[in-house]
Amino acid sequence: MEGSGTENPCSTTVGWLQQDNDAKPWLWRFSNCFSRPQQTLPLSPQTKDYMENKKVAVELKDVPSPLHAGSKLFPAVPLPDIHSLQQPKVQLSTVPKVSCCAHCTNDPSTSPVRFGGGSGGGAGSLVPPGALLDSQSTRTITCQVGSGLAFQSAPPLQNASARNTLAGVASDFPSMCLESNLSSCKHLPCCGKLHFQSCRGNVHKLHQFPALQGCPSSAGYFPCSDFTSGAPGHVEEHVSQSELTPHLCTNSLHLNVVPPVCLKGSLYCEDCLSKPARNSIIDAAKVWPNIPPPNTQTAPVTVPLCNGCGTKGMGKETTLLLATSLGKAASKFGSPEVALAGQMLENLPPIGVFWDIENCSVPSGRSATAVVQRIREKFFKGHREAEFICVCDISKENKEVIQELNNCQVTVAHINATAKNAADDKLRQSLRRFANTHTAPATVVLVSTDVNFALELSDLRHRHGFHIILVHKNQASEALLHHANELIRFEEFISDLPPRLPLKMPCHTLLYVYNLPANKDGKSISNRLRRLSDNCGGKVLNITGCSAILRFINRDSAERALKRMENEDVFGNRIVVSFTPKSSELCETKSSNATADKVKSPKKLKNPKLCLIKDISESPSSAKAAPGKGSQANSGSATRNANVKSLQELCRLESKTGTRSSEPQQGHLRLGAPPHRSSSAAAPAPKAPGLAESVYKTNPKKESLGARSVTSSPVEKKEKEETLFQVSYPSAFSKLIASRQVSPLLTAQPWSSRNLSPNLLNRASPLAFNAAHSSVGADGPDPFAHGVDVQISNLDYRLSRKELQQLMQEAFSRHGKVKSVELSPHTDYQLKAVVQMENLQEAIGAVNSLHRYKIGSKKILVSLATGAANKSLSLLSAETMSILQDAPACCLPLFKFTDIYEKKFGHRLNVSDLYKLTDTVAIREQGNGRLVCLLPSSQARQSPLGSSQSHDGSSTNCSPIIFEELEYHEPVCRQHCPNKDFSEHEFDPDSYKIPFVILSLKTFAPQVHSLLQTHEGTVPLLSFPDCYAAEFGELEIVQENRGGGVPLEHLITCVPGVNIATAQNGVKVVKWIHNKPPPPNTDPWLLRSKSPVGNPQLIQFSREVIDLLKNQPSCVIPISNFIPSYHHHFAKQCRVSDYGYSKLIELLEAVPHVLQILGMGSKRLLTLTHRAQVKRFTQDLLKLLKSQASKQVIVKEFAQAYHWCFSKDWDVTEYGVCELIDIISEIPDTTICLSQQDSEAMICIPRRERTQDEIERTKQFSKDVVDLLRHQPHFRMPFNKFIPSYHHHFGRQCKLAYYGFTKLLELFEAIPDILQVLECGEEKILTLTEVERFKALAAQFVKLLRSQKDNCLMMTDLLKEYAKTFGYTFRLQDYDVSSVSALTQKLCHVVKVADMESGKQIQLINRKSLRALTAQLLVLLMSWEGTTHLSVDELKRHYESTHSTPLNPCEYGFMTLTELLKSLPYLVEDQVFTNDKTEECVKLTSLYLFAKNVRSLLHTYHYQQLFLHEFSMAYSKYVGETLQPKTYGFSSVEELLGAIPQVVWIKGHGHKRIVVLKNDMKSRVNSLGPSPASHETQPSAPERILEVPESPPASELRLGVGGDGPHPAEQELLRLTDDSPVDLLCAPVPSCLPSPQLRPDPVVLQAADLIWFEEHPQEPSEIMILNQEEKIEIPVPIRNENLPPDPSSPGVSAAVPAPPSPSSETPESLLSKDPTESPAKKQPKNRVKLAANFSFAPITKL
């Protein structure tokens, strides 16, 4: 620096800053306040000419004007020549400009001050540091205020003008703000930090500039007075608080202060004032002590130092003290900062923004944050924000928009969208409140187009004097526009906002409404829809079923209506509103995202990983990129070239584009995981300068896992493949991630559980993906653009569809907006639903929260479905992989693959979709067909045997022959091989002969394990006989053709835990399955092979192999004979290509769970595996045991029983073992058990004694089976469909343990009279028995004929109408008939055939009332006391003899009386059973046995009535035991009596309730038995006395008087029947006989002899004996020769039924009771008649 000087800069003072000695401290010369532009600033002698510059780069028009008051005080003072100050605008230099500290020396770190802002030597002059203060002349200099922090500044703005960037010129105006570049002075600027460390010389005191008269506290400059010499020290020790200058902002970024902020005469920028003070107030007493304080009485206010926006200081920054002179203390505002802010806000006019966001909504694809920012930038300058409010229905508005408004601190007022003008009323109220709160001047910004605001705007403008700014749409009314001061079109206002989504395309104005109630008339629904959409101008076009169509005048109205109407209630249904009809939703989804549906606002990306994209070069701004193909900032990521320093900086980064890059460079991408999950992502990057507009037309909602490259050329494919980034995702959404790939072409690994390691399936693991090409992903539609589908299963089918939809709507709406809820029909008895949510994040949250959430009585299963077009492809990819992974070499012919696919998944395959799965499969032309192959990158590691085996040791037990990764193994054991010169190359595999041995597995198994132990776990199969002979002796080998032996290789594989593997050199090796001995307690079944999962053709082939080999001798067949044997057995060719194989050996190796290949070379043998043999033997053994009557067989008799059952000799080698016990021991104990019985081993089926409850449940199950099969075609169904059908039909699970069984087949066998199990090959068919089939067919015929006119049908039309009614054809052969006429003969109890003129006609028979028959049969059964049960034939005879009419069940609709009785399950116990005499018998249930006792009890009472509260005691005394209703399943006596309505009924109320016997039960047909109590307590009488009658009823005591006509007995006073041998009145009265209660009846009797007896008594008669305990009248027949001397003897009082009288006298007809006495109006049943009308009631209490 040539102009640098070494003189102390503080030795002299500047002249114009120097005071006169005689002047007062507060007097200044105003002429010294301005520097003359004509004079140059004198410099030190070392200063060169280039330091002189007479031009100043400041124009007056660029400087804020000083205060008007101050300018008027000095009118005579000439201002400097402004024109001389002007100079051309000079572009800023790219070199950072710094300011010079005038108090510092020319330190090497200090740069010279450049005046004029020029970049060249002539454009400005440089002033060396220190030279400013050396001059003795009176010139002006300015000390800039800046930060002492030195670092490289940001690149300068390219459009900045020179007039806004002064470098260091002294200002002539005290209130102007100067630009200040960051200071590089390490000592800090003099007005900045006050702690100087290296100041040399004297410290200068800066005196305050005298204030203008009009503005006493105006800011001024301070002269540099004489500093006291000394060492550098703290300036603050010499400066008083009152001498601190007000803040002078010199920040170049703060020159936008228009109008300037004037605070008591000082000018501040708003940015500086908005910053809080960082330090406390400095002690005023220690600062500027020699300068008197200013003339003010107010406390100083601290103002933060303008340190440059966006920069930070290095330490404690000094605050500037500002004195106020208006006489108001700032302390009343609290802190000084609050006081300053309050003063500032008082001087700014308020502004309020009122936004009708439903009228002027945030445009699609734009952010609400950008709109709010635009409003504030446009209108808020010079104002203070007093109100910013928007009104909307937050449940209808986009949640992202609401969140953005909240983030912008905008008041969001919620209103009900369906209420008319709710938003307008709320805004009008807010406008009125604003006018009441604030006064003019104030500004109101209204964002709306509604004319309803015209009145409020008029008052605000004309009465309150507010400034009105109206932001409106094009269709605004003139009445509204007239009242605004400023008009701004809303479309223009937001037109240049950067779009974040594709621009909205024109669309229809129709809205489709779904889920309308079907039970309401169309007019009501139309009125409701019109009310919902009236505010938006909607019109209901038509209503069809559950949907409707509404029309709107424009798209905006339709969108508003969709928000308001979505999920609204219409007569109990939550409606679904859409722009597209349901039939076209799929097509619309596959088309462009912006064509048919409303483009949703951007969603916040909830990516748990933060993407840091580094070193991505800039793309050319002029690139003609299609939408989605340009450079784009990825959501949740930031782009920059420098290192990212903080997360806050990362969120503020912008995407940069260069202008010189012609070939974009491929950068390296990496995904790094932050320590915690972020619930929100960084804000979208704003539009960078020069970025093409097409870049913003992409869809940022696309969430691509692969980073999108900025290039669109396919040449760089290799570069992209090298660019990987790693992502961690929860394993539950692994398939979802695959669906979100940009393109399936670049997927590195498929999403399949077969090729992922366990740690990848069980936790979130990094998975590698290829970086996707931007041009590839941009063309495909966004999978979740139109919503995300959530699949729900395990729904409660008991709920109605409407309830399910409503419950799911409520549950899912708590986690986000639900677009639709759709229920699928019942498919395989599974009810499923699909809930469509608006975005992916809400769907994931719903899945996490609602999985296994209980709806109804079930816990739903929730899973996430993939989206839109990729949904079907992702599903197809998974389905394809599941098929091909089970195919040989992962390939199948196309036709075979198509067949397998359609059979497995039940829907057609579109072959063209296979060509789209380029990352999963490849379709190759092979010969005359095409081959579908799984790509190596997608398939799991396959062993040579196919996918059923894996290479880990834990699953190598899938086959006895396993190809394992044994690199090499010796073909023989060198230790025990007799041929020491054995050469592997000379060995001929065809020469190997398979040995057949006879060994017990019980002995052989431990020997094999011991042999493996001594041979380190492996023994070559060729040397196994030699090694075994060396250890245990020679094997017992038999000839193959002689039989009786088992192949040694097969017997080895029968040992649990041992297998035979094949090394890579083809040598078979005997080894342990897990390369170690099995644990001693291991279940052998855990060590067996397992069936393959997948290919149904291979499963069918395995069944055929079993069927073929079990018919071969010893189940062994040479491999060369397999094809001819197959052809002969199945009468069809075994086409290997049909299964996708090219060689037979490959097909045979594909079923290792059933087929074992023995030997080697061309002489290999085929046999069944031990697992298949055990399963086969188990089935045969169960069939054998079930054929036995006792379900068991003695081991010694097993061979004979086997021969009887299967018609062939028993040979244990047929099942691959040598002893029966070897294979029986393999069967689980729950299937077969061995027991000892009389020193004999017994094989039996384990049977648990079922409880009575289980038996009862089984009976009910049989009824359920009948009900279920009656709904099936032909009353039959497949065995494997029973469980799902039962679950669907009855709504409950069929639990076998509930019935006491462990297998379903056993349960079916327990109901053989109901169900038959037919075996058709491998399939089982369930069908009803013949009797049940006819009963079901009869019910169908009744239904069919009743639906016809006149209940008849022509015989020729029967089969046709049957098929039409029931949906399937009628098969006569199922009923063993050949014609309909023969069928009607078997259904004679239902239909009859009538000959008509037109032909034979089938008619329903007229059935008799079954109710009356039921009552009659019940009376018979209750009257029967002979035995506990009664035969059906005897019951029929008894009925016919009693009612003198034949009992024909066909008249009642039943084929037999047995079937009729079975239809009365509540009356008849066990329905109908067979006794020892093979007779069908029947007995009453326990409940009706109780009813029988109740009937007998009520018969002992007058009128057969009894009070309810006395019933329990009377019953207990009558029966002899306490009545317990709970034993019958009831909680009270009243409920128990109510369960037998056929017997009794209860009438009355309260305590007057009476138990009354039904009229049908009053007839005493054969009431011959005694009471139960007497029958139990008294000894039996001699049989000849107590005879059980066979036919007519016996004589009984008859009470009552009256009759239909004259009768001789009416004249009797008291007598017995004619055959009575005893005079009762003359006999001694028994002591147990109580006195009767005689109540005279007021009937006038004729005079007669009251005591007249017969002269000639008859032989037998009846006496009435009262039971001593129960006091019940019991008629007992007495014969003369057997009459005891004491009538009270036990023999006489025995309570047994009495025989009828042998007299030839016919029993008299029963007499009628007086109608006034008995409500029953029935004839009396007593033989003993009283002349007087006495009520003979028994005494129950003594």
From Swiss-Prot:
GO terms for biological process: female meiotic nuclear division; oogenesis; regulation of gene expression. Disulfide bonds: none annotated. Residues 620-642, 655-721, 1678-1729 are annotated as: Disordered. The modification Phosphotyrosine is found at residue 696. Keywords: Differentiation, Meiosis, Oogenesis, Peroxisome, Phosphoprotein, Repeat, RNA-binding. Residues 673-689, 1703-1712 have a biased composition (Low complexity). InterPro entries: LOTUS-like, Marf1, MARF1_LOTUS, MARF1_RRM1, MARF1_RRM2, Nucleotide-bd_a/b_plait_sf, NYN, OST-HTH/LOTUS_dom. The keyword Ion transport does not apply. It holds the Pfam family NYN. The keyword RNA-binding applies. One of its GO terms (molecular function) is CCR4-NOT complex binding. Residues 631-642 have a biased composition (Polar residues). It comes from the Eukaryota. Residues 351-488 form the NYN domain. The modification Phosphoserine is found at residues 65, 757, 1089, 1091, 1571. Residues 788-867 form the RRM domain. GO terms for cellular component: cytoplasm; peroxisome. Residues 872-946, 1000-1077, 1097-1171, 1173-1247, 1257-1332, 1333-1408, 1409-1484, 1486-1560 form the HTH OST-type domain. It is found in: Peroxisome. Signal peptide: none annotated. Interacts with LIMK2. Essential regulator of oogenesis required for female meiotic progression to repress transposable elements and preventing their mobilization, which is essential for the germline integrity. Probably acts via some RNA metabolic process, equivalent to the piRNA system in males, which mediates the repression of transposable elements during meiosis by forming complexes composed of RNAs and governs the methylation and subsequent repression of transposons. Also required to protect from DNA double-strand breaks. This is Meiosis regulator and mRNA stability factor 1. It comes from Bos taurus.
